[in-house]
From Swiss-Prot:
InterPro entries: Dehydroquinate_synthase (IPR050071), DHQ_synth_AroB (IPR016037), DHQ_synth_fam (IPR030963), DHQS/DOIS_N (IPR030960), DHQS_C (IPR056179). The keyword Cytoplasm applies. Catalyzes the conversion of 3-deoxy-D-arabino-heptulosonate 7-phosphate (DAHP) to dehydroquinate (DHQ). Its cofactor is Co(2+); Zn(2+); NAD(+). Keywords: Amino-acid biosynthesis, Aromatic amino acid biosynthesis, Cobalt, Cytoplasm, Lyase, Metal-binding, NAD, Nucleotide-binding, Zinc. One of its GO terms (biological process) is amino acid biosynthetic process. Gene3D superfamilies: 3.40.50.1970, Dehydroquinate synthase-like - alpha domain (1.20.1090.10). It comes from the Bacteria. GO terms for molecular function: 3-dehydroquinate synthase activity; metal ion binding; nucleotide binding. Its EC number is 4.2.3.4. Zn(2+) binds at residues 186, 251, 268. It comes from Rippkaea orientalis (strain PCC 8801 / RF-1). One of its GO terms (cellular component) is cytoplasm. This is 3-dehydroquinate synthase.
């Protein structure tokens, strides 16, 4: 059964379609959007090897002319150089303003495809077809697109909304366990910042550390409630002028860890988990929430199979310095998203470097 979640924003609207087992019907879902004939699929070789034929055949069946551009997997390729190569392919196939770029992949592919679509001919159509849990519940929704800069993650980008987010949860069967757990970090985030009932439902599940531990109903619930939480926030604050910043819970320290480890040894979800644990400890030091609540958060992170300790090779002073490049810095002050209870957070710029350092020292993997 398909679930449709409408996203209504001041200047546009689109749907998130959650349709298990229906990747082969993608073309028919695009037909009502009145897109131009040309479609450029952007993916990575591994994902395209799994799902490329299904998607291409579906689009051709609906009368689209289909081209492809493959980018090697990983954050290391999330660069302006990679975007320039997408432009070359778009030019080669003469993509027009009515044409469409489809992101078939995880969060990295989605971010890059959105940025390429936003900037090619000053903006062409863009469709998200996420294949990782992290992309399904977070990265594909809300219109944040971009690439990394050597000094920080996602520093170059644009807000650019897709015409459709098309989610087929059945594609997760090919997702590596580590990537599944990374996606679960974002699901836990929604439980902390917005949806207490989701958090409690995750607590009640027997196991959460691999896809096979979830029945279809629980997986559908996790994806649907997470998508709805993000839509609720984004629909109130599309351009992150206020409320939307809460979606960065765990990301302030998390992004710094990712950047300083070269986007190689620690993936996004793992870094976010480390950041959430740190934020929970900071919230205790500022008397914002209780020891019991941070224990519940940390136990759920552990239940998912995520490591929350910080590598001892990481220079904590460098982490603190790197925070100054965070996108949420305002008037020179680093803004943290801090929990006040399960399901509620605040935005604070009152976190001193001393508090950050003391928390992270205790979080280092001994």
């Amino acid at each position: 059964m398909s679930i449709i979640i409408p996203v209504k924003l001041p200047h546009t609207s689109y749907n998130i379609a959650i349709a298990p087992g229906s990747l082969s019907q993608l073309g028919s879902h695009l037909e009502p959007l009145k897109l131009g004939q040309k479609i450029l699929i952007i993916s990575n070789p591994e994902i395209f090897n799994y799902y490329g034929d299904v998607v291409v055949n579906s689009l051709k069946k609906s009368g689209f002319e289909v081209f492809t551009h493959l980018i090697p997997a990983g954050e290391a390729y999330k660069t302006l150089d990679s975007i320039a190569q997408v432009y070359d392919t778009a030019l080669e196939h003469r993509l027009e303003r009515s044409s469409t770029m489809i992101a078939l992949g995880g969060g990295v592919i989605g971010d890059m495809t959105g940025f390429a679509a936003a900037t090619w001919l000053r903006g062409i159509n863009f469709v998200q077809v996420p294949t990782s849990l992290l992309a399904m519940v977070d990265a594909s929704i809300g219109g944040k697109t971009g690439v990394n800069h050597p000094q920080g993650k996602n520093l170059i980008g644009a807000f650019y909304q897709p015409r459709l987010v098309f989610i087929d949860p059945s594609v997760l069967k090919t997702l590596p366990v580590r990537e599944f757990r990374a996606g679960m970090a974002e699901v836990i985030k929604y439980g902390i910042i917005w949806d207490k009932a989701l958090f409690e439902q995750l607590e009640q599940a027997k196991t959460l550390d691999h896809l096979n531990s979830l029945n279809d109903e629980l997986l559908q619930t996790i994806i649907t409630r997470s998508c709805q939480a993000k839509v609720d926030v984004v629909s109130q604050d599309e351009k992150e002028s206020g409320l939307r910043a809460i979606l960065n819970y765990g990301h302030t320290i998390g992004h710094a860890i990712e950047s300083l480890t070269g986007y190689e040894t620690i993936n996004h979800g793992e870094a976010v988990a480390m950041g959430m644990v740190a934020a929970g400890k900071i919230a205790i030091k500022l008397s914002l929430w209780t020891q019991e609540e941070t224990i519940r958060q940390d136990q759920l992170i552990d239940k998912v199979g995520l490591i929350s300790t910080i590598p001892k090779t990481l220079d904590i002073d460098q982490v603190i310095e790197s925070l100054q490049s965070d996108k949420k810095v305002k008037s020179g002050k680093v803004r943290f998203i801090l929990p006040t209870s399960i399901g509620k957070v605040i935005i604070s710029d009152q976190v001193s470097s001393e508090i950050i350092k003391s928390v992270m020292i205790h979080q280092v993997n001994k």
